[in-house]
Amino acid sequence: MSSQDVLIHSDDPCHPANLICTLCKQFFHNNWCTGTGGGISIKDPNTNYYYLAPSGVQKEKMTPEDLFVMDAQTLEYLRSPKLYKPSACTPLFLACYQKKDAGAIIHTHSQNAVICSLVFGDEFRIANIEQIKAIPSGKVDPVTKKPMTLSFFDTLKIPIIENMAHEDELIDDLHKTFKDYPDTCAVIVRRHGIFVWGPTIDKAKIFNEAIDYLMELAIKMYQMGIPPDCGIGEEKKHLKMASP
């Protein structure tokens, strides 16, 4: 086995090389990463290597042999599959690693994200929904010193940026959202999809699932005439009356 192949072969199902393939299959079946769209990257906390899904590979068929591996310090590729090129998302993934101290980043072409980008302006907003409690607030508990999540009564805000012809051209707007929304764990790209990051792949996955649930709920609320961030008890004021 070559030194490059050692990086991607492990019997541990939670090894980044195995986990990326498992999650890509799941995301494909969730209709989030079809037609080779989307991507994922995981930082191995044991080696500080970045594992990156390649460009142009059907996500449900991805294998560890398809993955790129990069040194987090030098940003040099330690492993590059001959048949593929790096994901166009790579500069955006690196920005999340370097500026947000992410441990993993998920990029999907979720239809819910795309539709929300058409309905909302510069930011997605939803409030007073239980699932919001799965999203980090960016604050730290003064007693336990542990990260706090949003509360039921908080408003989740996710910035929306404009799409570009090429994904690497999104980098300036992504850096701007880091400054304007320092506590966000996601950014929606209009007519394109969403990027979600977290301190670990488990957290990033939870955030991504919760946000997609909330976006789907917001779309249904919008169809009913209910603003997704309306106050508790105000829902019926906005309900569209059914036709007789």
UniProtKB/Swiss-Prot annotation:
GO terms for cellular component: cytoplasm. Zn(2+) binds at residues 107, 109, 192. The active site is at 130 (proton donor/acceptor). Binds 1 zinc ion per subunit. It comes from the Eukaryota. GO terms for biological process: L-methionine salvage from methylthioadenosine. Its cofactor is Zn(2+). It catalyses: 5-(methylsulfanyl)-D-ribulose 1-phosphate = 5-methylsulfanyl-2,3-dioxopentyl phosphate + H2O. Keywords: Amino-acid biosynthesis, Cytoplasm, Lyase, Metal-binding, Methionine biosynthesis, Zinc. SMART domains: Aldolase_II (SM01007). It is found in: Cytoplasm. Belongs to the aldolase class II family. MtnB subfamily. PANTHER family: METHYLTHIORIBULOSE-1-PHOSPHATE DEHYDRATASE (PTHR10640:SF7). HAMAP family: Salvage_MtnB_euk. NCBIfam families: salvage_mtnB (TIGR03328). Catalyzes the dehydration of methylthioribulose-1-phosphate (MTRu-1-P) into 2,3-diketo-5-methylthiopentyl-1-phosphate (DK-MTP-1-P). This is Methylthioribulose-1-phosphate dehydratase. It comes from Saccharomyces cerevisiae (strain YJM789) (Baker's yeast). The lineage of its organism: Eukaryota, Fungi, Dikarya, Ascomycota, Saccharomycotina.
